[in-house]
From Swiss-Prot:
Function field: Catalyzes the N-acylation of UDP-3-O-acylglucosamine using 3-hydroxyacyl-ACP as the acyl donor. Is involved in the biosynthesis of lipid A, a phosphorylated glycolipid that anchors the lipopolysaccharide to the outer membrane of the cell.
GO biological process assignments: lipid A biosynthetic process
Quaternary structure and partners: Homotrimer.
UniProt GO MF annotations: N-acyltransferase activity
SUPFAM superfamilies, per database record: Trimeric LpxA-like enzymes (SSF51161)
Residue ranges the record marks as coiled coil: none
Alphabetized UniProt keyword annotations: Acyltransferase, Lipid A biosynthesis, Lipid biosynthesis, Lipid metabolism, Repeat, Transferase
Pathway per the UniProt entry: Bacterial outer membrane biogenesis; LPS lipid A biosynthesis
Name used for this protein in its record: UDP-3-O-acylglucosamine N-acyltransferase
HAMAP family xref list: LpxD
Enzyme class of the recorded protein, top EC level: transferase
Known EC number: 2.3.1.191
Length: 336
C-alpha cells in the first residue's frame, strides 16, 4: 500500500493528482479500480485510458491530456510498471532456518538467514548464501554454490557442481546440471560420453518452470548475468548464453551453441549446435537457426499461418521450386 506521492518518488515520476491518494494493487487499464495502479504504453489503447477507473495510470507525456484520473508521467510506462510491481508482490513468506523435515549434509554451509524448506535435500559441500531460499522437495547436489538472495522454488533438481550467482530465481520443476546428450557410436550401439563439466549461472538470472539446463561435457555450460529463460526451454551441454539475453518458451538450443548478449529469441525457435549468434540479434518465433549469425538484426524462417487451401497450394509449389529453377536457367541461356 503506497500513496501516489510515495510512488512518484520511487519511480521518478511527475504526479498529476492528489499525493495522498492510496493504491494497494495493480490492474489492467480496462479493469483497474480506484485503489489500483495501471499503465498505458501503446497509444492504440487510448480509448481504454479515456474510460479507465484506475486509481492512477503510468503514462508518457504524450497521453497527459487524455487521462481522466490521477497520472504518473514517466518516460517508459511499461518499465515503470514493472518496477512498481515489486511494491505490490504477494510472495510466500519464508522463515530463516532449516525445516525439521529437510535433509542437510553436515558439511553443507548454510547462512543463518537462508531458508531450507520441508523435504529439501542439500548434499555435501553445498554453500547456501545470505537470504537464499530453497523451497520444499528441491534437491541441491554436492558441491553446489547457491548465491545470496537466490530463490529456488519447489521440486527443483540441481545436480552436483552447479553455481548460481546472487539473486537468481529457479522456478518449479527445473533440472539444472543433468547430463548432456553425449554419446559415441561404437558400431553396435552407443557409448556414453560422461559429462564432467558443470553449469555456471550468473547474477539476476530467472529460469522459468520446467526448463532444463544440461551440464557441460568437459567445460561448463554458462548462462550470463541478467538472462531470462521462459518455461520449458532446453539448453544443451556447453551452451553459452550472453548477458541479458531473453528466450521464450519451448525454444531449444543445441550443444556448444554460443548466443551473444542482449539477444531476443522467440518461442519454439531452434538453435543448431556449434554455431554462434552475435550480440543484439532478434530471432522470430519457431525459426530454425542452422548457421552462425554475425550481424545484429532481426531474423526469421517460420511460415505464417494461412488458410488450408492456400497453404496446400504453396507447399505444392515449393516442391516444384527446383524444377522451376532449372527451367528458368534454361530460358536464360536460350535468351543469351
Amino acid at each position: 500500500m503506497l500513496t501516489l506521492g510515495e510512488l512518484a518518488k520511487k519511480l521518478d515520476a511527475e504526479l498529476i493528482g492528489e499525493a495522498s491518494h492510496v493504491v494497494d494493487g495493480l490492474g489492467t487499464i480496462q479493469s483497474a479500480g480506484p485503489s489500483q495502479l495501471t499503465f498505458l504504453a501503446n497509444p492504440r489503447y487510448r480509448s481504454f485510458l479515456e474510460q479507465t477507473n484506475a486509481g492512477a495510470v503510468l503514462i508518457p507525456e504524450s497521453q497527459r491530456e487524455f487521462c481522466p484520473v490521477p497520472a504518473l508521467i514517466v518516460k517508459d510506462p511499461y518499465l515503470s510498471f514493472a518496477k512498481a510491481s515489486a511494491f505490490f508482490e504477494v510472495a510466500p513468506q519464508v522463515q530463516p532456518g532449516v525445516h525439521p523435515a529437510a535433509v542437510v549434509d553436515a558439511t553443507a554451509q548454510i547462512h543463518t538467514s537462508a531458508s531450507i524448506g520441508p523435504n529439501a535435500v542439500v548434499e555435501a559441500g553445498v554453500i547456501v548464501g545470505e537470504g537464499a531460499v530453497i523451497m520444499a522437495n528441491s534437491v541441491v547436489g554436492a558441491g553446489c554454490h547457491i548465491g545470496d538472495q537466490c530463490r529456488i522454488w519447489p521440486n527443483v533438481t540441481i545436480y552436483h557442481g552447479v553455481t548460481l550467482g546472487p539473486r537468481t530465481t529457479i522456478h518449479a520443476n527445473c533440472v539444472i546440471g543433468g547430463d548432456g546428450f553425449g554419446f559415441a557410436f561404437n558400431g553396435a550401439g552407443w557409448t556414453k560420453l560422461h559429462q564432467v563439466g558443470g553449469v555456471t549461472i550468473g547474477a539476476d538470472v530467472e529460469i522459468g518452470a520446467g526448463t532444463t539446463v544440461d551440464r557441460g561435457a568437459i567445460e561448463d555450460t554458462i548462462i550470463g548475468d541478467g538472462v531470462i529463460l521462459d518455461n520449458q526451454i532446453q539448453v544443451a551441454h556447453n551452451v553459452v548464453i550472453g548477458d541479458h539475453t531473453a528466450i521464450a518458451g519451448k525454444a531449444g538450443i543445441a550443444g556448444s551453441a554460443k548466443i551473444g548478449s542482449f539477444c531476443l529469441i522467440g518461442g519454439a525457435a531452434g538453435i543448431a549446435g556449434h554455431i554462434e549468434v552475435c550480440d543484439k540479434v532478434q530471432i522470430l518465433a519457431m525459426s530454425l537457426v542452422s548457421s552462425s549469425i554475425k550481424e545484429p538484426g532481426t531474423y526469421g524462417s517460420a511460415l505464417p499461418v494461412d488458410s488450408q487451401s492456400r497453404y496446400r497450394r504453396n507447399v505444392a509449389r515449393f516442391r516444384n521450386l527446383d524444377d522451376l529453377a532449372r527451367r528458368v536457367r534454361k530460358l536464360e541461356r536460350l535468351s543469351d
